Amino acid sequence: MAGEGDQVASDAPVPSAVADSNGVESGNRPSSSNPEPSSDKKRVRTGSQDIDMADAPVKRQKGVAPIKAECVALPNIFIIHRSDNKAEVKTAPIDDDAAEAADARHKAGDSRDNRAGAKGKNNKKDKKQKGQNTSRTFGSSHDKLPLCGTRALSNEFSAPECRFGDKCKFEHDLRKYLKEGRREDLTTFDGQCPIYEVRGYCHLGWKCRFVGSHSEERATEHGRQELVLREDAERKAKFAGLEDDEVEVVNILPKEVRFGLSRRKIGTPRSDQYLEWINSNKDQERELFDNNQGDTEALKEERDARRAEYVEAPFRPSEKRRLYYGPETPVLAPLTTQGNMPYRRLCVDLGCQVTWSEMAMGMPLIQGERGEWALMKAHESEIAAPRFQSKGTVVQGYDNAADIRFGAQIAANKPWLANKTVEVLTDNCPKLRAIDLNCGCPINLVCEKGSGSALLDSEAKLENILRGMNYVSKEVPITVKVRMGTKDNHPTAQKLIKRLVLGGYEALASDKGTSGVAAITLHGRSKQQRYSKSADWSYIAECASLINRLKKEKDAQTDTAAEADPRDQANGGHVYFVGNGDCYSHEDYYNHMNNANVDSVMIGRGALIKPWIFEEIEKGQYLDKSATERLAYIEKFAKYGLQTWGSDELGIGTTRRFLLEWLSFAHRYVPVGLLEHLPPNIQDRPPRFRGRNDLETLMASEHYLDWIKLSEMFLGKAPPTFKFEPKHKSNAYEIEAEG
């Protein structure tokens, strides 16, 4: 899920480091070993070097981005354009629950509030669009005359017979389809098909909107002109034996496995054995708690023997692949909707070292639902090893060459569901860095079922879920993402972390061992808080200190009854700790690394607004990206989207939809060259401003029509049937039919 955090206070000045669009640096790079955090007393003024602002204090308005006066276009208010040509003045920041696919039921006064609508039907037009769109639709993208599948991949005179004959509802006349049944070819990407460029063929054939780049008209031996599809034999040979959806993509679920899961013909033997073992021990555990003065060693040996009866050589957490987190491994948060494969691929290009899938629900996975399994797909760039410079704590046995970047995040509300989900994932997804259990999602739809943040109030249950996941996950490590707690001013994360690292009393007494998690990620907000306040990095720092103390405490438990079984401790007993919340610059990143003492920082909204934050972290400087460079990232996303979802009308529509989802965040970026002071704050909202050129101004627009214009630069004009509803109702868009 998305989310990031606020700065740790300090009296030391922040090093100034700003680069122009060509990456020319001014100032010093922050060092992970020599912390130089930011200060409210001394700030860096852009356009100059290391200016001490104590001599020339400038009042900074809370919640408002400090844009240079000459760039401000209107008074200091935020304006949202609407299709009725009215403007709604916005004085509060947009709720960023859109990054977590939040529903609107927690909001008062949203579209479900009938106070305004009770006056009658005629009042509907005056009703403001607020809150979240919970049941969104996106129209349809299809050809005017759908082409029959027997013709799609065949040359004009070589198509097989359609078994439906004249009764077929689809078009068989190829020339008629090309002339009347589809829109004209796109001229973007130099008119070259992005799929053909990689594969040497296009699996969409005549349906491709770039078909002119891989087709031609040839004369036959009978003097007729035939339309034929071209192929590049050399490039095509590189992917021989692969299905169309397996080119440059891993973790593809075979059709027969998906069919078997949906028909319940594929079992989960490891989970069944583990659950049977747990259930068989319930009576003995009760006896243990009734008489806890018994022979602990004898009971331990008895349980080991019983475990061997039910589970055949299970993988213990300590036998799993080792993980590593360090200053050189910034993490991209699991982002619902926005965290799709093309976007993750773009972030990896820009320096992201660890990626996570969108949160997948457990039940659809074990039922073989195609949409949920699609979330497990990863691009081949995500299975490369993350950067490794041995700057952090390296556990014994860590093999960077065997490590990859991509992990899967799941949500589950019961031990049996989590166990079975992990088992089918590890059996069918060979490229997973780790599997993360989401205990931070605050949305009602998830929490009402007992998943997400709801697990924070059930610590023993959560521990049991994670322990079971470890038993069935083979060599794949298990991690967990949590929040501070469920309620404001009542954080519970420290208590939970202690249980997860050391093990709860009942688990240790019954010899179940610790949870075995290899890493814990903490989002510095509560479930109730959402994004109304900045993330609490001081609390994250306290939790990081706690984990360091717990390591010493575990060492002190040697030869005691409370000692955890070393076989149940992942990463040789070292639990990595990752902070999450409001990271928006390399200064934020290194501040958190140095002052909160986390092993790494997970970045969500900051990466949505400016994906090159990973590049800034690597180079240790601000990068003042030009509008042209930012447009190139949009072009790259569009290209990756077409390679993922297809270059036909349907694939272009899907790519456009997810591009607009990203632009609903990316338009918030304020170029650092327009700011009076650094570092920028992700919670600050800018007044309406003029960019340094028309393109930069366009890219900062909150108007949904301008997002459409940007998409049309690379995906062509949106069809009349296209409809876009962003998660914020104020930005909803439905294209008007021409004429």
Swiss-Prot record:
The record's principal subcellular location, in a coarse class, is cytoplasm
Q: Where is the composition biased (Low complexity)?
A: 8-37
* Compositional bias of kind Basic and acidic residues: 102-116
Ranges of biased composition (kind: Basic residues): 121-130
Alphabetized InterPro entries for the sequence:
Aldolase_TIM, DUS-like_FMN-bd, tRNA_hU_synthase_CS, Znf_CCCH
Its Gene Ontology cellular component terms are:
cytoplasm; nuclear periphery
Q: Which residues participate directly in catalysis?
A: C441
Q: Which GO terms describe its biological process?
A: mRNA processing
Among SUPFAM superfamilies, the record links this protein to: FMN-linked oxidoreductases
Q: Which GO terms describe its molecular function?
A: flavin adenine dinucleotide binding; mRNA dihydrouridine synthase activity; tRNA dihydrouridine synthase activity; tRNA-dihydrouridine47 synthase activity; zinc ion binding
Localization per record: Cytoplasm; Nucleus
Q: What class of enzyme is it?
A: oxidoreductase
> So where does this one cross the membrane?
none
Zinc finger regions typed C3H1-type: which residues?
143-175, 192-217
List UniProt keywords, sorted A-Z.
Answer: Cytoplasm, Flavoprotein, FMN, Metal-binding, mRNA processing, NAD, NADP, Nucleus, Oxidoreductase, Repeat, tRNA processing, Zinc, Zinc-finger
Q: Which cofactor does it need?
A: FMN
Amino-acid positions noted as binding FMN in the UniProt annotation, renumbered to this chain: P334, L335, T336, Q409, K481, H523, N580, G581, D582, G604, R605
Q: What does this protein do?
A: Catalyzes the synthesis of dihydrouridine, a modified base found in the D-loop of most tRNAs. Specifically modifies U47 in cytoplasmic tRNAs. Catalyzes the synthesis of dihydrouridine in some mRNAs, thereby affecting their translation.
Write the protein's name: tRNA-dihydrouridine(47) synthase [NAD(P)(+)]
Highest lineage ranks of the organism?
A: Eukaryota, Fungi, Dikarya, Ascomycota, Pezizomycotina
